């Protein structure tokens, strides 16, 4: 079963790279491998009805994130052998960053699909849609499937590419994520934690302490709180002018 999963993943990555000879040493392979794993982490689709309605998860997006960081906090309370603790902290770093990425992705999709104005801003500002071409006779069919196309595109988007996420939040939703150099570093470190079991490109073991995890939880939680408040304010009905 595991070999079938890896074969399917490799085939998908080669399709995205448009290179049938690509392998794990090809530029972009690791990022796409990460994306494939995250897109296939659930047995059932996260979003169910593409063409008609946005289907939210049973828990709130913030609730799902909070559950992840609460679990991480509880695990840090355990008394472990130093060698075990080092590896647990490495796994927790990857888990927390993944939880934030999931929140950023789900929140952006939900908010964008909630308004035709936001959908239009996305279509007009994102190069992926700006470069698409179709014939006159396709206008109506493309219009009917627009929301479905957008939902699928956003779900497939690699949301740990923070350089892409930040401007999308700003240009489409008008939400400024603020200065987050720590997040760029956390995402880069997550890559080593997830794909190299805590070792960097040179084979050096990365260092993650309990203080690092606690600080990461605080920064991620603060960012989630900010975005959640901004989204709530943004979606409030505007008072009518008399």
Which residues fall in each region the model found?
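Helix-loop junctions and short alpha-helical segments
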Residues: 43-183
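Polyanionic, low-complexity intrinsically disordered segments
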Residues: 1-56, 63, 67, 178-185, ...
